[in-house]
Design a protein with these regions (language model features):
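Non-heme Fe(II)-dependent double-stranded beta-helix
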Residues: 1-13, 19-112, 118-119
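Short, charged/polar surface micro-motifs in flexible loops or helix N-caps
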Residues: 79, 89, 104-107, 133-137, ...
Length: 270
């Protein structure tokens, strides 16, 4: 499924689009899982709908221990192999499952950001982004090509109001004003159909393409974050203390490789 050319493209650009890579069985389980979570939200359910808005923008993460549908996807689908092959890893752990729902009419979406500053992991990581409905370019994601190779971490913006978190440390710089200087960057985006997926590096800058416009139809996306064999747990600071404390309570040691039942090993070369 994954050619050498695709691996080279992923390593160079920080993102690839895989066509017809996810069988319908796994997509159906994802839809069922989201429906279940919406009826019975868990500890990590978040509602970023602006005050007074009638259309919701919600998401939830680390749902799989209470959602058998997501556990099945994580343990038995080809996602782990896809992630491991593109990252050129010896083995991979699934570090977080996550779904998003942006209802028709919702006028907010993810601003320019990359994932690493939101999470307590360092090393080689990727995200597999899976649309559960067809997504034209304007309803998908836009990426800054090659931005994962800039060697820079950016302050994490909070999604609901696009207000930066207080990220301690000189290594975190403000996200550049990409829209105002678009001529300085090369952008990548795709129209994606059911069964397609996007795979991107933890440091690749991206945003929801039509984040400043109302969604024309309801959008459901499921994402899975994977860490390669060099990934370690590294608590970042106060803005991630809820999740880092949660993982430490489950036995994950700071500065150590992933070793926690919540983040299972899902694929290995041998």
């Amino acid at each position: 499924m994954i050619s050498e050319d695709l691996v080279e493209t992923y390593q160079r650009d920080g993102v690839v689009c895989l066509r017809d890579a996810i069988p319908e069985k796994w997509l159906a389980l994802g839809r069922e899982g989201i429906d279940q979570n919406l009826k019975n939200p868990g500890r990590f359910f978040r509602d970023h709908t602006p005050t007074g808005a009638s259309s919701r923008y919600v998401f939830e993460y680390w749902t799989w221990p209470q959602t058998p549908q997501f556990e099945d996807v994580i343990r038995n689908s080809p996602l782990g192999e896809i992630a491991g092959t593109l990252m050129q890893a010896n083995h991979v752990h699934m570090v977080m499952d996550n779904w998003f729902m942006r209802e028709a009419g919702a006028s907010n979406g993810a601003p320019w950001h990359h994932d690493e500053p939101y999470f307590d992991f360092e090393g080689t990581l990727c995200i597999i982004w899976i649309p559960l409905e067809r997504a034209p370019i304007e309803d998908g994601l836009t990426f800054v090509r090659g931005s994962h190779r800039w060697g820079q971490l950016y302050v994490a913006p909070e999604f609901s109001e696009n207000v930066p978190f207080v990220c301690e440390g000189s290594q975190y710089q403000p996200v550049p004003d990409i829209d105002a200087h678009s001529e300085d960057y090369e952008f990548l985006s795709w129209e994606v159909d059911v069964g397609d997926c996007l795979v991107f590096d933890f440091r690749t800058l991206h945003c929801v393409t039509n984040r400043d416009q109302s969604a024309q139809q309801s959008q459901r996306r499921m994402t899975f974050r994977f860490g390669a064999d060099d990934t370690v747990f590294s608590p970042r600071g106060r803005w991630t203390e809820e999740t880092s404390a949660y993982l430490m309570g489950l036995g994950q040691k700071p500065g150590s490789p992933i070793d926690c039942d919540l983040m299972p090993k899902v694929w290995a070369t041998a």
